[in-house]
């Protein structure tokens, strides 16, 4: 399908500003190992000029995780251009907001590559964020301060317990609960009555 990136809110990546005009892009999405990467590569190479490829896969962002992630082969990547691959090491936290920021930072290169970009991947949250942008819940300084105070005085386990007590079902959704920054944000959202974002 062909879609255009919409105007995004002030808290999200604004592709229309980055490209000066709304960006048309093709989206090829599906589950891992369904063959979409190979199809996207062929389509990109048949385009004139060759179309840039933007990965929307939450596992392909990790350097060194090449087995089981269906990353394009080295020869295909050399024929590229590819974006959104090998952005961080596996031990680094990485959110959908970080993904949008990375793609935004790459926009000059994507534009310079020419052709209509092809977004390929199977992470629905990444695809949704590219199409609709992100509008994260508002900050709640009082709740954040309370979380930071618990962390400073009693440590991460106490903060985890406090956040879990606010909403056990929602807290169970938290990705990387050993990351203090994420637990602080979870406490802030749950104390304000917000659900946690769906994990990528």
Task: Locate the predicted segments by residue.
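Phosphate/pyrophosphate-binding catalytic cores of soluble transferases and nucleic-acid-acting enzymes
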Residues: 2-8, 12-200
């Amino acid at each position: 399908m062909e879609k255009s990136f919409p105007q995004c809110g002030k808290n999200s990546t604004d592709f229309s500003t980055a490209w000066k005009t709304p960006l048309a892009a093709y989206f090829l999405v599906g589950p891992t190992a369904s063959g979409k990467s190979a199809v996207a590569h062929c389509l990109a190479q048949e385009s004139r000029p060759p179309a840039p490829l933007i990965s929307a896969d939450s596992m392909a962002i990790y350097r060194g995780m090449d087995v089981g992630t269906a990353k394009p082969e080295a020869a295909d990547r050399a024929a590229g251009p590819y974006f959104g691959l090998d952005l961080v090491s596996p031990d680094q936290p990485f959110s959908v907001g970080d993904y949008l920021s990375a793609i935004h930072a790459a926009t000059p290169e994507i534009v310079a590559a020419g052709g209509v970009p092809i977004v390929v991947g199977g992470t629905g949250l990444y695809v949704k964020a590219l199409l609709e942008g992100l509008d994260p819940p508002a900050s709640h300084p009082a709740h954040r301060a309370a979380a930071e105070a618990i962390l400073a005085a009693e440590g991460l386990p106490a903060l985890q317990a406090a956040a879990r007590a606010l909403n056990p079902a929602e807290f169970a959704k938290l990705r990387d609960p050993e990351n203090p920054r994420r637990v602080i944000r979870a406490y802030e959202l749950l104390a304000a009555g917000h659900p946690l974002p769906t994990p990528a």
